[in-house]
Amino acid sequence: MPLKKSELYASIWASCDELRGGMDASQYKDYVLVLLFVKYVSDKYVGQKNPLIVIPPGGSFAEMVTLKGQKDIGDGMNKIIARLAEANELKGVIDVADFNDEDKLGKGKEMQDRLSNLVAIFENPGLDFSRNRAEGDDLLGDAYEYLMRHFATESGKSKGQFYTPAEVSRVMAKVIGIGAAKSADTTIYDPTCGSSSLLLKAADEAQVKISVYGQEMDNATAALARMNMILHDNPSAVIWKDNSLSSPHWKEKDGRLKAFDYVVANPPFSTKAWSNGFDPEHDLYGRFEDGIPPQKNGDYAFLLHILRSMKSTGKGAVILPHGVLFRGGTEGEIRRNIIRKGYIKGIIGLPPNLFYGTGIPACIIVLDKENAAGRTGIFMVNASQGFMKDGNKNRLRHQDLHKIVDVFTRQLESSKYARMVSLAEIEANDYNLNIPRYIDNSAEEDVQDIAAHLLGGIPECDIAGLHAYWQVFPSLRLKLFALARPGYVEMKVGAAQVKAVVFEHPEFKAYHARSMDLFEAWKKAHRPLLAGVGLSKKKLQQPPKK
């Protein structure tokens, strides 16, 4: 019997209640997620031959169960985790939380009860991951991200940097075209990977398993990323803990930065101390040839690092605040140089308040080196109005996500939403990329007709605004409206009768019949395909070609 996500989420989230009080959310996530990891790998790999994760004697969740009610439960849990970490080269990854910390977990009986209750929650038979569905199922990974999303919400603005909303991650994955990747040699990199949620979503978009690289400077967050990769059945992914700007880890043998096929990133906004630990004027990797960013704002430092980390055929997407689009000074010079090189393929303006670490509106800058030489314009999308409220944050809906991706990938121009802006127009605007300068999505003013209010009647211009309908049903207009006086019409039928008049009109009936014929033809042609839709992740059988 497969696990239900709702039951899994409820059971795991209940464990957080055992830890509240002694620490804030940014700390108790370390405990809950480590236990989730230990329970999962114990259920999944214990007793297996050649497992991805080795479960050593005295290093499984079963040993934790035997500690319930014992005075030394905290110390015992630490030792179990240490054995598991040592057997799998996971030191510094899964042993970041101290289960014997009296300041966070209480003293004596309080710690004993709290940890015993916590283990009991994970001991629930309903959380038997050995009975999980097929190999590679993301049920556990989804639960992991569910927890991280809630931790980010509770942690507040200063602690939510480790998570990129899944919808935004999917947009980035799709607009860089990683779905076209067919080889396991394809590489993807995130220099500020956080918990790796963005990196995972991007890698999952590929048709095959690709090579995944990440770097994260925060120790606890880097540990989250490594565990997240394992829980998503991606144990070969390599996450390095260090500062990507001052100490980039991924390099070629000759010392140059390693170049990747795809790069995605959601770096911290407007980092003030970005140059700590190295001298940008004498950068060993040539990242700042287009200019050195301001000392107290690192937005362009990350962008330049990303560009340097892309192959000559590389694609990328990075989330940055809107300020990078229009700020002047040295940032303006860097922006001009990057635009002239043709590296920017497009810009997607996102709704405000999407991210847990900040309420600042952000954009996705889409990068493309492969087609840079022939670039004649930058495709801009103003998606700032498409979202739903989700608690105290905003969130992209499925229709918002699909609209952004469809419009961007097909380069479809849409009034007040998207257009291709020529490089000549951008140059004429002094390389200012502020989206409202090129796409006006302000609401049209509601013009009131005073004469209609005073004398009655419906302005003919309002009726003419429905011209798309009158083209299909030309005589229906005459059936509904009569001239009242020059420029104004009046209804020939009462409001209650409008629907019946429309439905009984010959032109509407003929249109409806044609529509149904087309639908029936489509249904007949696609029935074999639709009949194959089920819960299986296997590729659907296509209908036989005629």
Which functions belong to the PLM regions below?
Residues 130, 201, 272, 389-390, ...:
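Short helix/loop capping segments that flank catalytic or ligand/cofactor-binding pockets
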Residues 363-364, 368-405:
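Conserved P-loop NTPase
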Residues 23, 39-45, 147, 151, ...:
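Conserved NTP-handling cores and scaffolds of large molecular machines
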Residues 1-180, 244-249, 349-352, 375-376, ...:
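Non-catalytic, mostly N-terminal accessory regions of nucleic-acid modification and defense proteins
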Residues 7, 11-14, 18, 27-37, ...:
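Conserved Class I SAM-dependent methyltransferase catalytic core
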Residues 158-265, 270-291, 300-301, 320-323, ...:
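Conserved S-adenosyl-L-methionine
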Residues 37, 231, 269, 312, ...:
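Short, well-ordered loop/turn and helix-capping segments at boundaries between secondary-structure elements
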Residues 108, 133, 214-218, 262, ...:
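Hydrophobic alpha-helical scaffolding
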